[in-house]
């Protein structure tokens, strides 16, 4: 267990929180992180590519010329692959690129990504945002007070409408909850800003 500073939205220290080393201070497994990122990117692919084979191309139902006696090569349809306008051989068809990763590997990838951010000083814990209404100006001020870089992943314990609406128009800022936390978002951000309650929830889920 290690202590992490908990900051207020004005940048001052509010206290500290003790978090498990098994979640936030392990030796990052880069291979597992790489596999998790590949899995997510594969799942994001649409896979709607499609071409027509010889049976799907319109026309070509009639034999272009008789089988024998013309001196030309035998042909059965003008929609065969060797003809202009013919079907495509072994072309791409709609498919899903997603695949599965064992649960233990997924959890290890998340712990590794979080630990990597902690090692790189890209992990900040805040007590709470306490926004009473959606205000982009107020949220921008919070990021400035905490001296965070431009690309920030904000993690809340559950959906916070005020935080989401306040941050959605700020370039480089992404909002997620503990249940939506993933390796691609963590590694893409320069810094992770997480509430104390969310950090405890992550520890509970991944610990």
Swiss-Prot record:
The protein's job, in short, is: One of the primary rRNA binding proteins, this protein initially binds near the 5'-end of the 23S rRNA. It is important during the early stages of 50S assembly. It makes multiple contacts with different domains of the 23S rRNA in the assembled 50S subunit and ribosome. Forms part of the polypeptide exit tunnel.
One matching Pfam family is Ribosomal_L4
One GO term in the molecular function aspect is: rRNA binding
Q: Which gene encodes it?
A: rplD
Q: How does it assemble?
A: Part of the 50S ribosomal subunit.
Entry's family note:
Belongs to the universal ribosomal protein uL4 family.
Q: SUPFAM superfamilies in the record, alphabetically?
A: Ribosomal protein L4
The answer to keyword Ribosomal protein applying to this record is yes
Residues covered by region (Disordered): 48-75
Keywords linked to the UniProt accession: Ribonucleoprotein, Ribosomal protein, RNA-binding, rRNA-binding
State the name under which the record lists this protein.
Answer: Large ribosomal subunit protein uL4
According to its UniProt entry, the protein's GO biological process terms are: translation
Question: Which PANTHER family is this protein grouped with?
Answer: 50S RIBOSOMAL PROTEIN L4 (PTHR10746), LARGE RIBOSOMAL SUBUNIT PROTEIN UL4M (PTHR10746:SF6)
Query: Where is the sequence biased in composition, kind Basic residues?
Result: 60-71
Q: Name one GO cellular component term.
A: ribosome
Tree of life domain: Bacteria
């Amino acid at each position: 267990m290690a202590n992490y500073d908990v900051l207020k939205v004005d940048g001052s220290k509010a206290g500290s929180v003790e978090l498990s080393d098994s979640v936030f201070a392990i030796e990052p497994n880069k291979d597992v992180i790489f596999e998790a990122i590949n899995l997510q990117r594969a799942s994001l692919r649409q896979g709607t590519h499609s071409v027509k084979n010889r049976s799907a191309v319109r026309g070509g139902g009639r034999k272009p010329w008789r089988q024998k006696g013309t001196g030309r090569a035998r042909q059965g349809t003008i929609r065969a692959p060797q003809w202009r306008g013919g079907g495509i051989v072994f072309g791409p068809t709609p498919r899903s690129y997603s695949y599965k990763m064992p649960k233990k590997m997924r959890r290890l990838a998340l712990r590794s990504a979080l630990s990597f951010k902690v090692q790189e000083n890209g992990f900040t814990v805040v007590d709470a945002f306490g926004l009473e209404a959606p205000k982009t100006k107020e949220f921008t001020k919070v990021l400035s007070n905490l001296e965070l870089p431009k690309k920030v992943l904000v993690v809340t314990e559950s959906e916070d409408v005020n935080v989401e609406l306040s941050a959605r128009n700020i370039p480089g800022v992404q909002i997620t909850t503990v249940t939506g936390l993933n390796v691609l978002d963590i590694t893409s951000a320069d810094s992770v800003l997480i509430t104390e309650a969310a950090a405890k929830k992550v520890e509970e889920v991944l610990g």
